[in-house]
Curated annotation (Swiss-Prot):
Transmembrane segments: none annotated. Disulfide bonds: none annotated. Belongs to the elongation factor P family. PANTHER family: ELONGATION FACTOR P, TRANSLATION ELONGATION FACTOR KOW-LIKE DOMAIN-CONTAINING PROTEIN. PROSITE patterns: EFP. This is Elongation factor P-like protein. CDD domains: S1_EF-P_repeat_1, S1_EF-P_repeat_2. One of its GO terms (molecular function) is translation elongation factor activity. One of its GO terms (cellular component) is cytoplasm. The gene is yeiP. One of its GO terms (biological process) is peptide biosynthetic process. InterPro entries: Elong-fact-P_C (IPR015365), NA-bd_OB-fold (IPR012340), Rib_uL2_dom2 (IPR014722), Transl_elong_fac_P/YeiP (IPR020599), Transl_elong_KOW-like (IPR013185), Transl_elong_p-like_YeiP (IPR011897), Transl_elong_P/YeiP_cen (IPR001059), Transl_elong_P/YeiP_CS (IPR013852).
Length: 190
């Protein structure tokens, strides 16, 4: 079993009889000698969908669950439900808008390549996105000539409604690459 300091975002833990998906991890390093680093983890309970927050010391042993991953393509929206189709056997997987609210901020209208669903014991748990996505800037302050030398940023609204900080020289209509987990600008898209 792994230690708390080996846990990554997207892993699933069996903790206090609950299946919890790791949504976010904050690492708090103490300044006092001999004090242990604390890992504050935010989870989503698989069965109830409730948000759960727990703290662990770096050397605490945690029980992880092995999941099965299936490649999927976005198929269609049916009211409040989003349907994804298995790439191999065409099994439909349905999520409510609330279940994948975060992921929808990064998903272009027609879906994106390399998406996976996580299942455990036949139960649908989560939708996993690739590390990066290319999106178009739909609204931002106009680009400033000669701004490439400065490292200042400005907010930009992307085609999915997500707002991130981008360099000043970018303008509306440009496609950019975003690191999904860190919600940050990586560069212009190819």
């Amino acid at each position: 079993m792994p230690r708390a300091n080996e846990i990554k975002k997207g892993m699933v833990l069996n903790y206090n009889g609950k299946l919890l998906i790791v949504k976010d991890i904050d690492i708090q390093s103490p300044t006092a000698r001999g004090a242990a680093t604390l890992y504050k983890m935010r989870f989503s309970d698989v069965r109830t969908g409730l948000k759960v927050e727990e703290r662990f010391k770096g050397d605490d042993i945690v029980d992880t669950v092995t999941l099965s991953r299936r490649g999927v393509d976005f198929s269609y929206v049916d009211g409040n439900e989003y349907v994804f189709m298995d790439k191999e056997d065409y099994t439909p997987y349905t999520f409510t808008k609330d279940q994948i609210e975060e992921e929808l901020l990064f998903m272009p209208e027609g879906g994106m390549p390399d998406m996976q669903v996580l299942t455990w014991d036949g139960q649908l748990l989560a939708l996993e996105l690739p590390q990066t996505v290319d999106l178009e800037i739909v609204e931002t302050a106009p680009g400033i000539k000669g701004a490439s030398a400065s490292a200042r940023n400005k907010p930009a609204t992307l085609s999915t409604g997500l707002v991130i900080q981008v360099p000043e020289y970018l303008s509306a209509g440009e496609k950019i690459r975003i690191h999904i987990e860190e919600r940050r600008y990586m560069g212009r898209a190819d």
